[in-house]
Amino acid sequence: MVLRTLEMQGFKSFPDKTVLNFGKGITAVVGPNGSGKSNISDAVRWVLGETSTKSLRGSKMEDVIFGGTSARKALGFAQVQLTLDNSDGTLKDRGEIVTVTRRYYRSGESEYKIDGEQVRRKDIRELFMDTGLGADGYSLVGQGKIDSIISAKNEDRRELFEEAAGISRFRHKRTDAQRRLEQAQENLVRLLDILGELESCLLYTSPSPRDRQKS
């Protein structure tokens, strides 16, 4: 799987539609401080489902939208689209070219798409699970990431190793199944309580044998 293009519009310091093309081999993005290099990696992390504003170097999600300058008005949305060469079949059940799109409005609404089809954020995260390219994957190493891994708790480091080993998908499925089971058990308890109340009402309203004889 190879990154082919990254398209940004209204994202942080990129108000206009900006398309970056990546070829085979190593690509270096260079420029002076403040030119937006870090915003490119933020765009990749964001389109893959990142929701932590701290990881995106902001205080609120609205900060990803171009905030305007003295010469330009602020925009109402931010959009990033990632195009991947999937000819090696890393992403199962997908074509040779895969596009992932995320759009966020100042109103707080979000849109996610895979190959132009509207999906949930959960679907994007599951698509890249065990590939290392997810929002929490090991392919995105920001400043200070190595130090944070070294000082991280054992549980946090284990998640990184599980992602690298390709087994995090199963852990997430197990966690989701456990959550659904707990919810089903809670619903069953509530239903039994309601059934008990209905039975009590039925006994209370049922006529006694003497009342039935009178009738």
Residue ranges of model-derived segments:
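Gly/Lys-enriched N-terminal cap/neck module of very large, oligomeric protein machines
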Residues: V2-S206
